[in-house]
Structures are given as C-alpha cells and as structure tokens.
Amino acid sequence: MVMSGIIGDNFFIPSLFILSMFLAFFFRKRIVRKILFLEFDENVKNLAPRDFFYSILKMEKSIKSFYLAEILFLLADILFILFGGYAMYLERLELSKKYSYLLISPASFVLDHLTLPIILWVIMFFLLLLTLFMIKKEKKRVSDMLNYLNKYNILNSAKTDFFNSDKIIKSEVILQSDIKLGDKYLFSIYTAYILPYSWIKDVKIEKVHGRGGSGGFYYLNFTLNKSFNPVRIFFAKKETAEQVKKFLLKKAFY
C-alpha cells in the first residue's frame, strides 16, 4: 500500500527530477566558485601552466555534478519503475480477484501510473548521452585552445594573472559561469575561455530575446585580431555587460 501510494502520487518522480537538476546546478556553481577563488589542492596549483589550465577548464570538472545527478536519477527511477510497478501490480491483481467488476487490467493500470516516470527516464537518458557528447567535444576544444595559446607562449603569464586577480564578475546566467578579469586576460570556466585583452579588436553587446520578445539575456560578441575560436560571454543584465565591455576595451587599447 505504501509503494502504490507513492506511485499514485504523480509528483514524486517529477519532484525527484527537479531536485536532481537543482542540486546539479548548485554544485556546479560551487565548483566554479572554488576554482575562481583558487580553492584547490597545492598539487593542482603546482602543475605546469598548460596542465593547470586543462585541469580546471576541462568540462568533466564543471559538469561532473550533472553527470552524477543524471546517473543517480536514472538508477532511482528504474528501481522505482521495476520494484514499485511490480508491487503495485500484485496489489492490483488482488483487488481484481476480489472485485471482478474492475474493467482496467492490473498491467494497464500500472502502466498508466508509470507513464510519467518512464518518460522522465527516457528524457534523462538522452540528457546523459548529450552530456557525454558535450564532454568529448569540449575536451577537444579546450585542448586545441590551450595548444593555440601555448604557441604564443602566453600560458605562463596567464597562470600568473589568474592567481593574482580577484576581480570576479557574476554572469547570473545558467549556461555561463562567473568570469574572472585579470590584468591581461579574461578567464571563463564554463564555457572555457582564456582571452588575452591584446587580441581584442572590438566588442559588441548582443541580445538573445526570450519568448514573446520579452526577457532574455545579453552577450559580448568579440572581434579578435587572431584566428581564435568565436568567444561569447553571457550576462543576465545589460548593465553588467556594458561594464565588462568598457573594462575590456580600456585594457585592449590603453
């Protein structure tokens, strides 16, 4: 009866789904903040510049909370479906024996109550596949970026700048981590960027509109004097984007 009562509550699995996503975002934010405020092991601090930046910028680090949340939800949901569904089936079978006038078969009744958990399991499974794909793709992008920066012999000074800087700007956008503005470089953990100010040719503020043309967020669209990957830094507030743009252009040209 307890299990069937839980299954009958249509809010249990959706609530678990929402909670797992909330915790993933919460812990990802914590991980990023620790990196920006240099709260990591001495072993990491003592790595060579390229290894150091790869260690803190690799997607596995910032997205690990999502990966774990997705796996835990999939396990919890499948156990819920298998064991809870079986318990509910047995209970419904007993009722159908006592009350022969019940028109819905036990299997159909259970399937009807488990439709939402099954749909959420499928959604989370595809999110997990997407996460694994993004990790693989981002790993290559970060590695290529660091190799490109290393060609210009700037990773040593970038590491020094990263440790000496304490200017943290909040993006307040889910898909963009807070950024660190050093004396010579911009640092973003997610999406991973190390951008020398001297490479900036121009910065424009663009807007991504929300549904119905209202809301949305802003991003800095960079024009660079090097053949670097496109760089976009997102912010929830236009005022923040304008302040960062002004700071970057000042550093780039003065």
Where are the model-predicted features located?
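Canonical alpha-helical transmembrane segments of integral membrane proteins
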Residues: 1, 12-23, 68-90, 121-127
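Acidic, Ser/Thr- and proline-rich intrinsically disordered linker/docking segments
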Residues: 204-254
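Short, charged cytosolic
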Residues: 33-55
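Phosphoinositide-binding peripheral membrane targeting modules
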Residues: 176-210
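Anionic N-terminal interaction surfaces
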Residues: 48-66, 123-180
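Transmembrane-cytosolic junction motif
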Residues: 24-41, 86-97, 128-154
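Membrane-interface segments at the starts/ends of alpha-helical transmembrane spans
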Residues: 2-13, 59-63, 99-119
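Membrane-anchoring hydrophobic segments
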Residues: 1-39
